[in-house]
Structures are given as structure tokens and as C-alpha cells.
From Swiss-Prot:
Protein name per UniProt: Neurocan core protein
Superkingdom to which the source organism belongs: Eukaryota
Boundaries of every Link domain copy: 159-254, 258-356
Low complexity composition bias: residue spans: 447-459, 569-580
Length: 1257
């Protein structure tokens, strides 16, 4: 293609020359009237392909009459461009009297080939063409006062694009690369095409095949892992000619469109097959990748991903805007995976780009005008596998969004984030007559920095329907129109009363964000009936525009949210992650955004569970709060089930009757913020005594723990409390200010005992301490009675261990042990009945929840620390009560019931100690301390300033000269350098941190270290560079290096290095190897060779072979004695390979640093300043003549790169006597020439065309 285009351009120029000669012989009579006449071209725009040559014609005629010498025609070529709404002429070249001057930026690309022989032919030869060369060109000819000009339009066709196979990166052989370009309506690009695209700013860090079987890629801005052809400089990097079977990507070149590409955006997006069919119905076909790039090149701008013929999804961007293609124009690709590989699945739904041949090419502005502003981007996240569920009573059918696969868009500043989440599935057995359980929609926490574990977003539990019961779905559909990115609306179906929001993924520590939206009983769990095993979930994060949707119609989703629901089927107790009617409190930590979904459906009547195992104790949440940085207190962890808070005053507990929820009585969509708790009744075993569950809002989360809010809390939801901050310093707390109250109830509930100290205003507090002990109570089995008034058996011990090990044994299955937590706590009082006051404590409680009996009723088995069973009452309830003064919990409900209050039998009187807590969580190695109420006295003593009268520094416990410093009863040692430890008893090695710079050797001594510096370095740490390198050379560890990009054979390269007082580089350490390899990114010669003795490799600078870095199975002497020289292979991190010495490659020279000795002495002169022994390269010294002598010539000399000084030019002489100077001053015999003859030549006035020479070289 290149040779043909050059010949065509040459023939065009020849034809133009013949044309002008004929025109000059047959001039019109009107032409003779003017001295200058421009032969204007009447044809249309000139089209030429990228990287080719083009001739822009410019002819004029001259009247053959005599004219002054100054009337020589002046020719000027300019490019007309528009800037700020005004036309500007960009100079290209000027020519006059066979002198041509080319403007900067056009040198080497433009010429006037016919002008030297035919001064009336100013045809401009331009090339190799770039895409930016398209535009309007002006040829202007000026002769005297006559001025003629002509305009020529140039259109550069063709575009270079990178193509990656669908299956993976670097997956194409050379033959496959050619075929891929052919299927994309293009050809494989030539090196000149890629070079032209690079010169226009094309940057792509993917190696791809070119037509000459080389592999290259263009880099306009070097960055780690993506370098140009030279170190940290832009260029097209080449791997050279490669084996055709090697695998790379490919660069394609599309030349002409030959039709039109148009965008198809139906109301409902299409699968790949649907997109093909839709284009065929419109008399077109899916556009190819090359056709879309050509359409983009011609002005197509559409911020909507669409299917193409090869199964990829792309969209063209002309005007970059926020969340629409990144910061630069181009064709963006939507990849399936986050590493920019894979095409979307054929079943995914997008719009389409169709191509219709032999139609008018769309002009700029024909496409749909994109809307401006902060518009959304298309985000897709793959959700959990969707089990085949049938809609339950009161449920609605929810249609999944159109996107079916996770998608990541390439080339964007704000990438389409993707997080794949899978949820484990549990199948719960159900017997006839059991309750109909609703699926609870839980929002999980995802992080963009990684892929969460399969269970990180909850547990999928398959719903079951009682046998013989048929539940018909009652779908009530609505169609929501989501405003698109340039005016159109995406169509999405969903339930009327359900708006699903998402947890925002962030690269920062995960933040729990759950949406508190109204979900009435009619808005039940999604019923997904799909043939696929995986049903991804996605939303369109655009502005929500749903007409007629009530108050939710004008809501806008956050900018970049993703959601992936998890389904939970609770057995008898719902998860606290889905608490109705809660809003985050005003005093919650800013790092936690709390919101809860309403339960989608609740039974209208109490139902009796039957043989349903419950994973009640399934998760424990660990949160650590770093506090405010106070040094007085350690970081305290919170081991809790639900996050329950304490009240410092007495309040009331609401006694709410069961609330049957039905479609006629939906929950309110909003709850006042002061109503922190809303009780919800569920059906229990006894229809007459439904158990009551009250769920509390989550508490404040940790700001410093990466694990905060990353573990879901399930199955613990029968305590009721609200949190109130406790003001005042820690030392003023007493037991009356810390209160925990379980809710007394006749029904079986799952409870916790929680102790929280929340001290946000304390100047000495380092956070908050929470100690939660998980206990459980169950209703008696049928046929058994329980005396609720019976007295409990007192059990007490002090300073013992509380072990909470949730263990669930499923009927007929293996025991599951999801979490264990062990904690040492102070004694706790436990009442074995549900109505009496606390009177004693248990020493150690090992809680095991198992399925007991035929009916699978879970029982609680507390055991003592000695292993004996303390209490095992499957027919009773076990309620944990604190030993603090009683108080009640608060709720702003209308119906309230007073909880009896009283004083405990005894108060804690254990000595105040800090008891360590070991958290048995795999995700955390945090060791913290919990507090006992007895800490009050300890901190009061500290606050009062009491201390041991004995001075701890009296005997100076610090060793090795350390200084003892006291702080009350505590002391600390300030150690001298080289020592560490509590008493400065550890002699540390100062050289472990490598303090010596520039390759210096560190030697550890008794009280410090010393550095042995390499030559040319000095200072205590070898930080001073005492010797330098010549210009263009780089210094590293005492030597100077220089990379030469021009190619030579090995012997010629060594000879060139020796001319520069060096050798081909030698390598003696990994650090030096890394430094040398950073110069160029092509294979380069080094000084290693075995030319003298086979297999005996030596360096040319005669240094020893101390370090080797050969490629695998090298050296191999492949050419049987012809591989005697060594090259650094660039694409293998500079590993060595022996090759024939006649290869022409770049090379690196190495030489020592250079210094000059004392400057040479000059007669009758001395140096200015202090005389030194050594001088760096390029140093300059000045001489001054002694007193009584006059200076002649230059007084300075310079130290050259060869270590030698310039020859001094200064001459100091004594002045002659004045009378002798006067005697020889006048020479009467010498005849002076007339002044006229000494006059300089008259300077010619500057021509007007020379005024533009400031723009030219």
C-alpha cells in the first residue's frame, strides 16, 4: 500500500507539472492583463489515507514583462484553523527566489518538490499524513502589490485501533490477528500507520501484531510497566520480528466506511441475537469494530454501550464528559471482567450499533446530542445464584434488570466497578402445617478492592411452601423509566412499593450502608424464576425518573452504587439486619450509614413452627474503636451480638400486642427519628402467646478496624434498648450509670446481655467498651409445664471465663460451627427463671444450641468451667440479668408497660483489674482488654495523683547509659543510639536499616556505626558526591554510564566506548543490573564475551565475574561457536543471552568518574580563590595577573571530561613606557584610505517576506 501511494503521488506531481506548462503556453487574454494569476482548483476535497503522501496543488502564472528585481514572487503555505471562534493561519513554509524555509513542527513532513525547477509550481507535498492534518490549507502568492491565494481542503481517512480477542489478553497468533482485523472491516496496521497514530497522541500499553510481523505498542507518556522506545521518553516500543505462533493483541487499520453507522436504542434493551435481528429488520447489520471506529472518526458521539458484530460492546465518545468514557475521546469497550478481558455474555442486554452500506455518511451533529451535566454511568454487578422460588402470599413478581453480566468499561477515569458475590445456600426442611416464611432482603457490604467471600453478604436459604398449599402470585407491575446518559430513558420493571438501593463500594475501609425504605406486606421478596443457575443483579445508576411513583418519583440514586441482594429465610426469629422502622440516630458515627429494610412480608396470623432448625447463634460482630488518641486507656474491643446500648436513667418498656400484618395494614413508610425501636410480633409455638421480638438500631461502628461491620449478625433479636451517651470523665462512673436490662417475657426469646460504656465526651477515654454475652431461652415443649415463679439456684464465681460457642446441629446433618468467641469476664448473675431478681452468678457458661428430641427443638446447655453441667433445662428459660441497679428501657410508644425495678442482692466488689480478652476470630488478631466495674476505683486513684512514695528512678534501672524518666509510679528509659528495650538492655544492630547511601558498606560498632564509602563519595553516610560525570553520563555507585540508542555491532560498540575512555558496561550486583536495565527498553550490548576462550566469559574492563543473570538454558552457543557476545534481553527484565557479535544493537558504556588535578601554573599570574588538590569535571578557575602586569586574552580555564584542563590563554605582560608608545603612535608615511572606502557595505532593507522568519528555523 505504501509503495503504490508514493508512486501515485509522484504521478500526480508529474501531471501537475505538465498541466502548468500547457497552461502557460495557452494563457487567456485576460490573464495577460495581470502580472500574477492564480490557477485555482475547482475540485472538491482531497482525500488521502493515514500515513500516506499527498500533493496539495498550487499553480500561478507570471506576466513575462520586465519587472524590478524586488518583484520576485513570494509563496506562503498556511493551515487555516479555528481558535476561540476566529480563524487563524498556522504557518507551514515560505519560499522566495528558490529559498524555502519550513516552520517548526512541519520540518521533515513538507516540501515543494517542483519549485526549484518551476517557480510557478508551489504544489505542497505533505506526509506521512496524520489524522490531525485534516483541514483547510491556504496557498498565498505575493508579487509586489499583487496578492493571489487559493484554498485546498484535505481529508485524512482511516483510523488505527487496538483489538483484543474475546477470550483473553494476548491470545492471537499472527494469522489469527490478520483474520480478526479482516472480520472487523479492517486490515492489519503497518508500522507507519501506528507511528502516525502515535504522533497524534495514540497511547496504548498493549503489545500488538503489525503487518511486518513485528510487535509494537505506542506510549506517549511513560509509566511503570509501560515505557516507550527509550527510557522515560515517548515512542513506539518494538519487540522486533516475532515468531508467528506467539500470542499478542493486534493493531488494525480501517480505511473507509462506505456507509453509515447508526445507533439503535429500543425501549427494552437487546441480547446479541436480538440486536442482530433488529438491525436486519432495518435493512442493516450489526456494525463491526472497524466501522464503529470510522464512524467515531467522522464524528459519531453516543454515550450508550451497544452490541457489535463480533459480540463486543462498545460506544464512541467525541466529547469527554463525566462518567462517560474517561478524559479523552475514543471508542470505549465494555469488558466482562475487571482486568479488561472478556466480552459480555450473549444473553446480556444492551443497545446496538448498526451499519447500512451505501448510505450517506453521518455528519457531525447528526447523532443524538448528548446531555450535559453529572450523568450516571452504567454499572453492573453480578449477584448470587437465583434459586427457583415461587411467589408467596402477598408477594409481587420482581423483574430483574436487563444487564445479565458484570461489566467493566475500559479507558475511563471512573471505571465501571464490578464486584462478584456469591451467597451460600441453605435448605430448610418444612413439615406440613409449618409457617410460611418470608425471604428477607438484606443489603450486604462490598468493597471495590477485592472480591468478597461467598458468605460475606449473607446466606441464601431456599424458601419452602407447606405441602398441599398453593400460593398464587399477585404480580402488580410498574414500568420505571430511568433517564439515560443523553436524553433517552432506560426501561426497567419492578414492584410498585419497592425501591432498592445499594451499599456503596469504596476503596476505603468498608462502610455499612443499608437502605431504610418502606417495604409493605405487598412488596414481598423477589420471586425469581430463571433457567440460569446464576442470575446477576444490576441497577442503572442514572437519575431516577419515575412518573406517578408518589414521593419516590423524584428521588435520585447516589452516583456509584451497586447492590446484590441476599435472601434469608428466618426460622422463628428474623435477623436483626432487617429491622423495620429504624432511622440512624443523630449521634451515630459518621463512618456508618445505618438503614434497615422493612420486612417484605409477615404472616397475618401466628403460625406454629415444626421441625425447623434455627441458626440462631450464627454470627458475632467484632468492632474495635481507636478512640480519641488518649494515652491513658487501651483500645477496647466490642464483642457483641445485636448492638444494644445502655441508659443512665429509668425508662419504660413498651408492651405491644401482636400486630397482624396484611396487605390492608402496611407498615408506615417513615418513622420519626426519636422512635429508635419498633417491636414486631411473630408467630411462636403457642398461638395464644406469640413471642415478641424487638429489634434495636445498630450502634456506632469502629473507625479504625478493617473488619468493622464486615460480619453480619444473624438470629439474635429479642433485646430492646436504645443508646444514650454517658457524659463525664471515666473516673466518675459508678455502677449506677451502667445498666443492661433484658426484656422479661413469658414467650421464648433469644436474648443477650450487653454492657456498653459510651464516653464520647470524656477527655481521658480511648473509645468505648462493650461486653456482650449471648444467651438463649426457649419455650417449654408440649406436655411440660414450667413454674415461672420458682426460685433460681444461686451459682457464683469470680474472674472466670465466659465461653460463647454458637453451634447448630441440623437434623440429619452435620454440626455447623460458624463462629467462636471466648472472653474472660467478671462474674455475672444469672437467673434460672424468667421473673425473679438476680441473686447469683455462674462461673463459666458454655452455650451449645442443638436440635433435641424428635421435633428438633433447640436447647441450651450451659456447663461450668470444670466441665459439669450446671443447668440443663430444656423446659425452662434462662435469662441473664446484670448485677447493677435495675432500670428500664425506653420507647416512645403509646402502649407501655412498667418493668419492675429493684436492687440486686449484691454488688460487684472484686478488685479492679484489666482482664485480657482473646477474640477467637480468624479475621482478626486483635488483643484487647475489657473493663470491670471495679475499674472505677483504679482510675480514681490515678486521677487523684496518689503514687508510690518510692522513686522508681532512684536506682536508675536503665542500662547502657540510658536516662530514667519518671511519671508518678511509672518510669521509662530513654536509650542511647544502638540500644533498645524497656531498660535499654538490647544492643541493636544499627546496620539493619542500611543507613549508608550510594552503595557504602555499613560496619556496626559498640555505640554506633561507620560507613565505608565507594570511590567518589564522602560524608558520614556516603551522601556527598565528590566526583562527577561528563554531560550525558549518569552516575551510579562510583561509575558513569551512558546509553547509546544508535545500533552497532558488538566490536564497534566496544571501540566507541573506548574512545570515550570507557568500556561496554560490566554488571556486578543486582542493583547495578537494575540501574542499567532502566536505560533503554531494547536488547542492548554489555561487555561480557567469550571471544578469547569458548565458555570462559570475561568483562572487557577486566573485572571479575561476580554476578550472573542468564536466561533459562543460557548460554547455549546455539550457532556452534558463533555466539560469543552477550546481550541484555529487554522484555525478560534484562536477563542475559549469548548471540552472534555481528548483531546491530544499542549499547551501554561504563567508565570511572573524572577529576582534574591542580590547574597549570601561568607565568606572572595566580589563581583567584583557594587552590584545591582535585576539581570536578566542568569546574572553572580564573587567573589574575600579578601586580604591575597587564592581562591579555581569556583568564578562565575549564576541567574537561578527560580529566585535563584547558590550555590557559591568559598572558600577563609588563606595560611599555608611555613616551615610547607616543613615539610610535603616529606614522606619517602611512596613507589613510578615504573614509568612503572604509565605509561598510550598505545594508539592504529587509524584504517584507523576511518578517515572518521568526516562525522558521
Amino acid at each position: 500500500m505504501g509503495a503504490e501511494s508514493v508512486w501515485a503521488s509522484g504521478l500526480l506531481v508529474l501531471w501537475l507539472l505538465l498541466l502548468v506548462s500547457g497552461d502557460q503556453d495557452t494563457q487567456d487574454t485576460t490573464t495577460t492583463e495581470k502580472g500574477l494569476h492564480m490557477l485555482k482548483s475547482g475540485s472538491g476535497p482531497i482525500q488521502a489515507a493515514l500515513a500516506e503522501l499527498v500533493a496539495l496543488p498550487c499553480f500561478f502564472t507570471l506576466q513575462p514583462r520586465q519587472s524590478p528585481l524586488g518583484d520576485i514572487p513570494r509563496i506562503k503555505w498556511t493551515k487555516v484553523q479555528t481558535a476561540s471562534g476566529q480563524r487563524q493561519d498556522l504557518p507551514i513554509l515560505v519560499a522566495k527566489d528558490n529559498v524555502v524555509r519550513v516552520a517548526k513542527g512541519w520540518q521533515g513532513r513538507v516540501s515543494l518538490p517542483a519549485y526549484p525547477r518551476h517557480r510557478a509550481n508551489a504544489t505542497l507535498l505533505l506526509g506521512p499524513l496524520r489524522a490531525s492534518d485534516s483541514g483547510l490549507y491556504r496557498c498565498q502568492v505575493v508579487k509586489g502589490i499583487e496578492d493571489e491565494q487559493d484554498l485546498v481542503t484535505l481529508e485524512v481517512t482511516g483510523v488505527v485501533f487496538h483489538y483484543r480477542a474475546a477470550r483473553d489478553r494476548y491470545a492471537l497468533t499472527f494469522a489469527e490477528a490478520q483474520e480478526a482485523c479482516h472480520l472487523s472491516s479492517a486490515t492489519i496496521a503497518a508500522p507507519r500507520h501506528l507511528q502516525a497514530a502515535f504522533e497524534d497522541g495514540f497511547d496504548n500499553c498493549d503489545a500488538g501484531w503489525l503487518s511486518d510481523r513485528t510487535v509494537r505498542y505506542p506510549i506517549t507518556q511513560s509509566r511503570p510497566g509501560c515505557y516507550g522506545d527509550r527510557s522515560s521518553l515517548p515512542g513506539v516500543r518494538s519487540y522486533g520480528r516475532r515468531d508467528p505462533q506467539e500470542l499478542y493483541d493486534v493493531y488494525c487499520f480501517a480505511r473507509e466506511l462506505g456507509g453509515e453507522v447508526f445507533y439503535v436504542g429500543p425501549a427494552r434493551r437487546l441480547t446479541l441475537a436480538g440486536a442482530r435481528a433488529l438491525c436486519q429488520r432495518q435493512g442493516a447489520a450489526l456494525a463491526s469494530v472497524g466501522q464503529l471506529h470510522l464512524a467515531w472518526h467522522e464524528g459519531l458521539d453516543q454515550c450508550d454501550p451497544g452490541w457489535l458484530a463480533d459480540g463486543s460492546v462498545r460506544y464512541p465518545i467525541q466529547t469527554p464528559r463525566r462518567r462517560c468514557g474517561g478524559s479523552a475521546p475514543g471508542v470505549r469497550t465494555v469488558y466482562r471482567f475487571a482486568n479488561r478481558t472478556g466480552f459480555p455474555a450473549p444473553g446480556a442486554r444492551f443497545d446496538a450499533y448498526c451499519f447500512r452500506a451505501h448510505h450517506h455518511t453521518p455528519q457531525r451533529g447528526d447523532s443524538e446530542i448528548p446531555s450535559s451535566g453529572d450523568e450516571g454511568e452504567i454499572v453492573s454487578a453480578e449477584g448470587p445464584p437465583a434459586p427457583e422460588l415461587k411467589p408467596r402470599l402477598g408477594e409481587q413478581e420482581v423483574i430483574t434488570p436487563d444487564f445479565q453480566e458484570p461489566l467493566v468499561s475500559s479507558g475511563e477515569d471512573e471505571p465501571l466497578d464490578l464486584t462478584r458475590t456469591q451467597a451460600s445456600q441453605e435448605t430448610l426442611a418444612s413439615t406440613p402445617g409449618g409457617p410460611t416464611l418470608a425471604s428477607w432482603l438484606l443489603t450486604g457490604v462490598t468493597s471495590s478492592t477485592g472480591v468478597p467471600s461467598p458468605s460475606s453478604l449473607g446466606v441464601d436459604m431456599e424458601e419452602t411452601t407447606p405441602s398441599g398449599t398453593q400460593v398464587a402470585p399477585t404480580p402488580t407491575m410498574r414500568r420505571g423509566r430511568f433517564k439515560g446518559l443523553n436524553g433517552r430513558h432506560f426501561q426497567q420493571q419492578g414492584p410498585e412499593d419497592q425501591l432498592l438501593e445499594a451499599a456503596e463500594a469504596s476503596a476505603q475501609p468498608p462502610t455499612l450502608e443499608v437502605t431504610a425504605d418502606h417495604m409493605g406486606p405487598s412488596a414481598a421478596t423477589e420471586a425469581l424464576e430463571s433457567d440460569q443457575s446464576h442470575s446477576p443483579w444490576a441497577i442503572l445508576t442514572n437519575e431516577v425518573d419515575v412518573p406517578g411513583a408518589g414521593s419516590l418519583g423524584s428521588r435520585s440514586l447516589p452516583e456509584s452504587r451497586k447492590w446484590s441482594p441476599s435472601l434469608i429465610s428466618p426460622s422463628t426469629v428474623p435477623s436483626t439486619d432487617s429491622t423495620p422502622g429504624l432511622k440512624p440516630g443523630a449521634d451515630e458515627a459518621p463512618g456508618v450509614k445505618s438503614a434497615i429494610h422493612h420486612p417484605p412480608w409477615l404472616p397475618s396470623e401466628p403460625a406454629v413452627p415444626s421441625s425447623i432448625p434455627s441458626e440462631a447463634l450464627s454470627a458475632v460482630s467484632l468492632q474495635a474503636s481507636p478512640g480519641d488518641g488518649s494515652p491513658d486507656f487501651p483500645i477496647v474491643a466490642m464483642l457483641r451480638a445485636p448492638k444494644l446500648w445502655l441508659l443512665p436513667h429509668s425508662t419504660l418498656v413498651p408492651n405491644v400486642s401482636p400486630i397482624p400484618l396484611s396487605p390492608a395494614s402496611p407498615l408506615p413508610s417513615s418513622v420519626p427519628e426519636e422512635q429508635a425501636v419498633r417491636p414486631v410480633s411473630f408467630g411462636a409455638e403457642d398461638p395464644e402467646t406469640p413471642f415478641q421480638t424487638t429489634m434495636a438500631a445498630p450502634g456506632e461502628a469502629s473507625h479504625g478496624s478493617p473488619e468493622a461491620d464486615s460480619i453480619e449478625i444473624e438470629g439474635i433479636s429479642s433485646m430492646q434498648a436504645t443508646k444514650h451517651p454517658i457524659s463525664g470523665p471515666w473516673a466518675s462512673l459508678d455502677s449506677s450509670n451502667v445498666t443492661v436490662n433484658p426484656v422479661p417475657s413469658d414467650a421464648g426469646i433469644l436474648g443477650t446481655e450487653s454492657g456498653v460504656l459510651d464516653l464520647p465526651g470524656s477527655p481521658t477515654s480511648d473509645g468505648q467498651a462493650t461486653v456482650d454475652m449471648v444467651l438463649a431461652t426457649w419455650l417449654p415443649l408440649p406436655g411440660h409445664g414450667l413454674d415461672t415463679g420458682s426460685q433460681s439456684t444461686p451459682m457464683e464465681a469470680h474472674g472466670v471465663t465466659m465461653s460463647v460457642e454458637p453451634t447448630v446441629a441440623l437434623e440429619g446433618g452435620a454440626t455447623k460451627d460458624p463462629m467462636e468467641a471466648t472472653m474472660d469476664v467478671v462474674p455475672s448473675t444469672v437467673d434460672a427463671t424468667s421473673g425473679s431478681e438476680p441473686k447469683s452468678s455462674i462461673s463459666s457458661t458454655h452455650v451449645v444450641v442443638t436440635a433435641a428430641g424428635d421435633q428438633g427443638t433447640p436447647t441450651l446447655t450451659p456447663t461450668s468451667s470444670e466441665g459439669q453441667v450446671v443447668a440443663q433445662e430444656s423446659l425452662g428459660t434462662l435469662t441473664s440479668l446484670p448485677s447493677h441497679p435495675w432500670s428500664s428501657l425506653a420507647s416512645s410508644m403509646d402502649e407501655v408497660a412498667s418493668v419492675s425495678s429493684g436492687e440486686p442482692t449484691r454488688l460487684w466488689d472484686i478488685p479492679s483489674t484489666l482482664i485480657p480478652v482473646s477474640l477467637g476470630l480468624d479475621e482478626s488478631d486483635l488483643k484487647v482488654v475489657a473493663e470491670s466495674p471495679g475499674l472505677e476505683g483504679f482510675w480514681e486513684e490515678v486521677a487523684s495523683g496518689q503514687e508510690d512514695p518510692t522513686d522508681p528512678c532512684e536506682n536508675n534501672p536503665c542500662l547502657h547509659g540510658g536516662t530514667c524518666r519518671t511519671n508518678g509510679t511509672m518510669y521509662g528509659c530513654s536509650c542511647d543510639q544502638g540500644y533498645a528495650g524497656e531498660n535499654c538492655e538490647i544492643d541493636i544492630d544499627d546496620c539493619l536499616c542500611s543507613p549508608c547511601e550510594n552503595g557504602g558498606t555499613c560496619i556496626d560498632e559498640v555505640n554506633g556505626f561507620i560507613c565505608l564509602c565507594l570511590p567518589s563519595y564522602g560524608g558520614n553516610l556516603c551522601e556527598k558526591d565528590t566526583e562527577g560525570c561528563d554531560r550525558g553520563w549518569h552516575k551510579f555507585q562510583g561509575h558513569c554510564y551512558r546509553y547509546f540508542a544508535h545500533r552497532r555491532a558488538w566490536e564497534d560498540a566496544e571501540r566507541d566506548c573506548r574512545r570515550r575512555a570507557g568500556h561496554l558496561t560490566s554488571v556486578h550486583s543486582p542493583e547495578e543490573h537494575k540501574f542499567i536495565n532502566s536505560f533503554g527498553h531494547e536488547n542492548s550490548w554489555i561487555g561480557l564475551n567469550d571471544r578469547t576462550v569458548e565458555r570462559d566469559f570475561q568483562w572487557t574492563d577486566n573485572t571479575g565475574l561476580q554476578y550472573e543473570n542468564w536466561r533459562e538454558k543460557q548460554p547455549d552457543n546455539f550457532f556452534a561457536g558463533g555466539e560469543d557476545c552477550v546481550v541484555m534481553v529487554a522484555h525478560e527484565n534484562g536477563r542475559w543471552n549469548d548471540v552472534p557479535c555481528n548483531y546491530n544493537l544499542p549499547y551501554v558504556c561504563k567508565k570511572g568518574t573524572v577529576l582534574c588535578g591542580p590547574p597549570p601554573a601561568v607565568e606572572n599570574a595566580s589563581l583567584v580563590g583557594v587552590r584545591k588538590v582535585k576539581y570536578n569535571v566542568h569546574a572553572t578557575v580564573r587567573y589574575q595577573c600579578d601586580e604591575g602586569f597587564s592581562q591579555h586574552h581569556v583568564a578562565t580555564i575549564r576541567c574537561r571530561s578527560n580529566g585535563k584542563w584547558d590550555r590557559p590563554q591568559i598572558v600577563c605582560t609588563k606595560p611599555r613606557r608611555s613616551h615610547r608608545m607616543r613615539r610610535h603612535h603616529h606614522h606619517p608615511h602611512r596613507h589613510h584610505k578615504p573614509r568612503k572606502e572604509h565605509r561598510k557595505h550598505k545594508r539592504h532593507p529587509a524584504e517584507d517576506w523576511e518578517k515572518d522568519e521568526g516562525d522558521f528555523c
